[in-house]
Amino acid sequence: MLLLPLPLLLFFLCSRAEAGEIIGGTECKPHSRPYMAYLEIVTSNGPSKSCGGFLIRRNFVLTAVHCAGRSITVTLGAHNITEKEDTWQKLEVIKQFRHPKYNTSTLHHDIMLLKLKEKASLTLAVGTLPFPSQFNFVPPGRMCRVAGWGRTGVLKPGSDTLQEVKLRLMDPQACSHFRYFDHNLQLCVGNPRKTKSAFKGDSGGPLLCAGVAQGIVSYGRLDAKPPAVFTRISHYRPWINKILQAN
């Protein structure tokens, strides 16, 4: 199987494409996911792309490192990204903390912290999301949710409105076709018997399990068939804490 680096995933999402779409999901109730962040990214080559992310502190957003770029603007409080509302807060990213061990071949350590130029104002439409402790190892079989503005089908454009889908955490064996899948660093998400998945455009968004962000959308198959691979947040809690404490 051909696996593509995550930057391409944002345009292909899942064989190894960056996961960026919600396939088989439904539209979220407006502003029911106040932690969601929409990232507009200018790449080093000039073209722009988009990713998801989520607010963990008033001045920090957590996302995937394959969403890094020359510059990033974060929109909080959005539901329809084409219709500006009073709830919107557009904030500039002043520093991108990319995980130092990120590997574009294995796609391990696909996690990044974004420091915002200004602190977000917490409102009914903008809020923070809890993330797990280092030793919180979420078990297979758990039903979780992922949200994003990504494609709703392999050949379809990105969604204007925030979409959400329920996905099951799978045993590591379900992701054995991904050559570099590592259960200690990553989560295998999505029942292969179902059509529901995250796809291009959802990259960087959170996997929410019992109210806690356990994973970050990373990559999957080019045809968007589940399961997909998510970064396991609990493994990176010490790294996250170190950056938050120093900034």
Swiss-Prot record:
Enzymatic reactions: Preferential cleavage: Phe-|-Xaa > Tyr-|-Xaa > Trp-|-Xaa > Leu-|-Xaa
Glycan attachment sites: N80, N103
Keywords: Disulfide bond, Glycoprotein, Hydrolase, Protease, Secreted, Serine protease, Signal, Zymogen
Signal peptide location: 1-19
Matching Pfam families: Trypsin (PF00089)
Cysteine pairs bridged by disulfides in the record: C51-C67, C144-C209, C175-C188
Location relative to the cell: Secreted; Cytoplasmic granule
Record keyword Membrane present: no
EC number in record: 3.4.21.39
Molecular function GO labels: serine-type endopeptidase activity
One record GO biological process: proteolysis
Family label: Belongs to the peptidase S1 family. Granzyme subfamily.
Name of the molecule in the record: Chymase
Organism: Macaca fascicularis
